[in-house]
Amino acid sequence: MPKARIVETDSGIEGEATVAIYDTMQRKLRDRGWIETNDVIQSGITEGLALEIGPGPGYLGLEWLKHTEGTQLKGLDISADMIAVAERNAKEYGLTSRVEYVRSNGNKMPFADSMFDAVFTNGSLHEWADPKNTMNEIWRVLKPGGRIFISDLRRDMFVLMKWFLYMASKPKEIRPGLISSINAAYTPDELKELIEDTKLASCKVSGNLIGVKLTGKK
């Protein structure tokens, strides 16, 4: 049995120094090919207007835009400091005309019903203050037939995998945050139970050595 979840902050990553460290870490993951752009695309999210929840510095969504044609993206993040970094990175990518970042949380998204062709997120699920409500909001803003991709760490990963992630995390200042994220993450069984009485109940939950994933369609 894994240890009980230790709930992490739902206030987002704030502070110029902290945000800069996180941006450096995410940029290194991108450069190593360790962000999940291919997984998002392989899930069928390849066209139209997508919503990314918790984009952080923006690399997953920006890489998705880079590798798809004619797509548009809105990023929803609670952190003003992180949005500023994401906007700077979008400018670096030359993609400012295709992406807009909005400051809000997932409990009451500032978007119309049936607005998006897809919703995706990586690494934010464990931070959601009211995950069931956020899942229902995802369903609300999706068009009929719209696709869903949610991925995150898993709390019950093998100790060896946790050690590997810890040692691979650079800069080293990010390591305490990694551990707190793992401790707050869901197991695949917990995620299956969590979605049972939400609009995402028909979605598929799967796992790998370090993470959990939810995919489906409206």
Residue ranges and their predicted role:
Residues 132-144:
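A short glycine-rich, Lys/Arg-flanked "PGG" loop and its adjoining helix->strand segment in the class I
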Residues 151-214:
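C-terminal alpha-helical "lid/dimerization" subdomain adjacent to the S-adenosyl-L-methionine
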Residues 51, 57-108:
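Class I SAM-dependent methyltransferase SAM/SAH-binding core
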Residues 1-45, 63:
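Conserved class I S-adenosyl-L-methionine
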Residues 95-96, 112, 201:
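Conserved H-loop
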Residues 107-118:
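A short acidic, Gly/Pro-enriched loop at the edge of an enzyme's catalytic core
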Residues 118-129:
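A short SAM/SAH-binding and catalytic strip from SAM-dependent methyltransferases
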